[in-house]
Regions:
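N-terminal compositionally biased, intrinsically disordered segments and leader/signal-like regions
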Residues: 5, 19, 28-31
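Bacterial N-terminal signal peptides
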Residues: 13-25
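Mature N-terminal, pre-catalytic/accessory segment of carbohydrate-active enzymes
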Residues: 26-289, 361, 498, 632, ...
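N-terminal secretory signal peptides that target proteins for export/translocation
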Residues: 1-10
Length: 785
């Protein structure tokens, strides 16, 4: 079983609670029946400094489980759980369904309950995906008028006589929730309607707004079904030189993001599973149905969205404003910018509201310490149109206790989300088609302040075994190496230190009327990370939500991070209140302030003198910004961390740490990690200086230490430790040991030995008798250690 280890001032560490007790306040902890000397497969310890987080304990390992048809056979779930209980160090399974069933079906509920009970009894907690997208048919049956629409604007020249016809093909979208190979229905077209039709004169610079006419009533519907919308328009002599602009609305097999009953329906799903011993619930990659290479003349729309838009902008009609957003109109550039600003802000705020309602429901149904999973990122890069139109870059506003991302999300985003969540680490769901890639990623993640949520190898090779998705990560030493790295979790109480904030203009990054669409300043962040000066990437909307704020010492602060420097990128279309924030920051002079990009219009499209409003910020070109900031950081005596290399392939490039180097956490922990040549780690025989105190390590893979203000050791973690010299703490071991050692809240030493048989080594027993033991998983063809 997996247990929670509660340090206390007693001669023997007490290991208490099942996984449920670790997450659910409603479940009382129970004393383990086994001896304290018996190795456990997972241990969680209470961490200091977690007042801002609902989760007070260290995080266990996390792996993905995708339930397919075999898992829904009687006892079919046991194979995956048995394998991962024996051959991984995971304590949690973020679990979703890749099968043609819905979570609202009683038989599915019952199978998931059996699986969750079995997993719990084998030391694993199931965090189940209970998103509405796994119950689309049930939602549509109950609320048939609350499905998502996508409006496609297409145009055709009109003639002076006769009739013109235009056919607009239907839409079919899909993602990981709609695996076609498993027979799951895509986000296909359910029905089609003509939303509106306009005619106007359009020149090279845009439509002449004085010529716009609503010609919806002139249109004759020839076909409106799941295949297309086809309309005929009788023409008139006055139509010569004009164009028709047809807005076709396709209703998709997906709930409307703005559906009035969406949040209520998802809450009911969670309540349906209240009797299941889940460790939490997942909502993965939420947003509108994702579109690859999205067109700027296709925009999401529903009557519920139109109502919200009218509420935000009295006197404005969303259907009419869609024409303005898509097609520039002469002399209406400010109005167009404002319409897009409101539309996109409305969208990302609604996506965040749905996410946060789901978070609240998880806590209400499963308890305050239940896990809210997984990641809000989809096409995981802030500088892609795919992500912009999927969710409006709402990532920072989606509440989590553990910062979570996926795939190749830039490290500057991962670290920022850790600050927002007040989580000591971030977790990134990673996959690749090559198993060898995971080895380097494991160490890169650690040096960037994070860990991997292990997604199976994907896509599997053509000749892979049928159960490769189940077993692909359990061969070799990958899982064992992850256990070594996760020794850091016992002593990491705060996220990685990033002294720079790159604050990108959220409106500009979402607005295609200006030059800043999908430009979040990542190139500047990359240039900083490349040199080892880490930066958090944060949207400007976090200022208006009062999450990015001025600290009591006058510095700009995000979660636990105080910034030595902050750069505002592309403030175009911001509200004037943003300037007030930076004027106050400039007056306090605790954070160096920089700006890239012009600010000539505010959120409503009105003329704005940003240069004067931001006079306290040094204006730089994007090319010069990183160098200027690095010079300032060096003048403060700040040292770089692990340098980075660029990741390319499939997404805009972003920086990732080398697999060998050094980083520092905000709690003062210094981490050395090295895994460039061996997945289990490379030798670390090194002396470092921490505030003039020398520390010498002889270890493998990881060597981490935190000193108190007097220079005494407060916590340490190391792989295959042979020796440590740090002030009055001297350790010399005849055999290498994986260990973590820390002071509990009473000031007493507590420790964990991993993969160690036999008596506690005498040098360690002299430090404390409070040692717990962790079992090491063995590769799938070996026995556990």
């Amino acid at each position: 079983m997996s247990h929670t280890h509660h340090p206390r001032p007693c001669p023997i560490p007490v290991v208490v609670a099942t996984l449920l007790a670790a997450f659910f306040c409603s479940t009382e902890p129970t004393r383990a029946q086994s001896s304290a000397d018996a190795p456990q497969r997972s241990i969680r310890v209470e961490l200091p400094g977690q007042e801002q987080n609902a989760i007070k304990n260290s995080w266990p390992g996390i792996s993905c489980w995708f339930m397919t048809a075999p898992d829904f056979e009687p006892d079919g779930f046991k194979r995956f759980i048995d394998l991962h209980s024996s051959h991984s160090g995971a304590g949690l399974l973020t679990t979703s369904i890749r099968h043609n069933v819905e979570v609202t079906q009683p038989a599915v509920h019952d199978q998931i309950k059996r699986a969750a009970v079995y997993a719990r009894d084998h030391g694993l907690g199931v965090v189940m995906d209970l998103d509405v997208r796994l119950a689309r048919q049930a939602f549509m049956s109950k609320y048939p008028d609350e499905m998502q629409e996508l409006v496609c604007l297409r145009e055709i020249p009109l003639t002076s006589s006769g009739e013109v016809t235009l056919s607009i093909p239907s839409i079919e979208l899909s993602d990981h929730y709609t695996p076609g190979a498993s027979g799951v229905r895509p986000y296909g077209t359910l029905s089609t309607r003509l939303l509106a039709a306009y005619s106007a004169v359009e020149g090279a610079d845009g439509i002449d707004p004085s010529t716009i006419q609503d010609i919806s009533s002139r249109c004759r519907i020839l076909q409106a079904d799941t295949n297309c919308l086809r309309v005929a328009i009788p023409t008139l002599p006055a139509d010569a030189g004009r164009k028709a602009f047809i807005l076709a609305a396709f209703t998709l097999f997906s709930p409307d993001v703005f559906a009035p009953h969406l949040i209520e329906f998802e809450r009911a799903i969670l309540k349906q599973y209240a009797d299941v011993p889940l460790a939490g619930a997942c909502k993965d990659e939420w947003g509108f149905p994702g579109r690859f290479a999205p067109r700027l003349d296709d925009l999401y729309f529903t009557p519920a969205m139109a109502l919200e838009y009218a509420h935000r902008r009295p006197g404005h009609d969303l259907a009419r404003d869609l024409l303005l957003m898509i097609k520039p109109q002469l002399g209406r550039e400010p109005e167009r910018a404002a319409a897009i600003n409101h539309y996109m802000e409305m969208n990302w705020q609604r996506n965040a509201a749905v996410e946060n309602a789901f978070y609240d429901s998880i806590k209400q149904v499963f308890g305050p310490r239940a896990m809210a999973a997984t990641h809000p990122t989809w096409f995981p890069h802030p500088e892609t149109r795919e992500e912009v139109f999927k969710n409006g870059l709402h990532w920072w506003a989606a509440r989590r206790d553990l910062a979570q991302t996926d795939e190749v999300t830039p490290f500057s985003v991962r670290t920022a989300l850790a600050k927002k969540s007040h989580s000591p680490i971030w977790m990134n769901m990673f996959y690749d088609g090559n198993l060898a890639t995971y080895s380097g990623e494991l160490w890169r993640h650690a040096l960037g302040g994070g860990r991997i949520n292990f997604h199976p190898v994907y896509p599997p090779g053509a000749n892979s075994p049928t159960d490769y998705l189940t077993t692909s990560l359990l061969h070799g030493n990958l899982m064992t190496a992850d256990c070594r790295i996760r020794l850091l979790n016992f002593i990491s109480t705060a996220p990685i230190d990033c002294p720079v904030a790159i604050i990108f203009g959220h409106p500009a990054a979402l607005n295609w009327a200006g030059p800043g669409l999908a430009d979040t300043g990542l190139k500047i962040a990359n240039a900083l990370w490349e040199q080892g000066f880490y930066a958090d990437l944060i949207p400007s909307s976090e200022i208006s939500s009062k999450n990015l704020k001025l600290a009591t010492d006058g510095s700009i602060q995000y979660g636990p991070q105080h910034y030595a420097a902050a750069l505002l990128h592309h403030p175009q279309y911001e509200r004037p209140a943003l300037a007030t924030f930076f004027r106050k920051a400039a007056a306090l002079r605790r954070t160096a302030l920089y700006r890239t990009g012009e600010w000539t219009r505010d959120f409503e499209g009105r003329t704005f003198d940003g240069a004067t409003a931001l006079a306290g910020m040094k204006s730089l070109s994007p090319e010069a910004a990183a160098g200027e900031i690095i010079s300032h950081l060096k003048s403060l005596g700040l040292q770089p961390q692990t340098t980075c290399t660029k990741r390319d392939g499939g997404f805009p490039g972003s920086m990732m740490p080398l697999p060998s180097g050094q980083c520092r956490l905000l709690d003062g922990t210094v981490i050395l990690a090295s895994g460039a040549t061996d997945v289990m780690g490379d030798p670390i025989q090194k002396t470092i200086q921490i505030a003039s105190h020398p520390v010498r390590f002889d270890a493998v893979g990881i060597a981490a230490i935190r000193l108190d203000k007097s220079g005494k050791v407060d916590a340490l973690a190391a792989g295959a430790l042979r020796s440590l010299s740090a002030g009055d703490l001297q350790i010399e071991l005849t055999s290498p040991v994986d260990l973590a050692l820390w002071h509990d809240s009473h000031g007493h030493w507590q420790g964990v030995l991993q993969g160690w048989d036999g008596p506690i080594p005498e040098p360690l027993a002299r430090i404390t008798t409070h040692w717990a033991r962790l079992r090491l998983p063995a590769p799938v063809d070996q026995s556990p250690r």
